[in-house]
């Protein structure tokens, strides 16, 4: 049985999923990116299964090489965008922690909560 057309189609689907994930990361659609990750992992597993059954010919490997490069480039870009997002989130968590510490230390003075008033006079 010739698996070449099915293998090529599986790789094309992986390219499509990879491009979708890059677009979602670029557009900062983080929830959608996470939701699409399982389909990407499943596509990778399908390719692994197909290549375990029958190793692709040298000709097929040459045809698949540009797809693999594109997938790896997309994955690298997604990782960079995710790192930027993680740094942003770490900064926000740090700011929140500082605010909580300040409120804890200075927010309750003598039983009264300090809050700005509209009219002081």
From Swiss-Prot:
Intracellular or extracellular location(s): Cytoplasm, Cytosol
Region of interest called Required for homodimerization, as start-end residue ranges on this chain: 1-50
Positions of region (FliD binding): 60-98
A GO CC term assigned to this protein in UniProt: cytosol
Biological process per Gene Ontology, one example term: bacterial-type flagellum organization
Pfam family of the protein (one): FliT
Organism superkingdom: Bacteria
Keyword Ribosomal protein included in the entry's annotation: no
UniProt keyword annotations, A-Z: Bacterial flagellum biogenesis, Chaperone, Cytoplasm, Repressor, Transcription, Transcription regulation
Main location: cytoplasm
InterPro entries: FliT
Family statement drawn from the similarity comment of this UniProt entry: Belongs to the FliT family.
Function summary: Dual-function protein that regulates the transcription of class 2 flagellar operons and that also acts as an export chaperone for the filament-capping protein FliD. As a transcriptional regulator, acts as an anti-FlhDC factor; it directly binds FlhC, thus inhibiting the binding of the FlhC/FlhD complex to class 2 promoters, resulting in decreased expression of class 2 flagellar operons. As a chaperone, effects FliD transition to the membrane by preventing its premature polymerization, and by directing it to the export apparatus.
Binding partners and assembly: Homodimer. Interacts with FliD and FlhC.
Stated name of the protein: Flagellar protein FliT
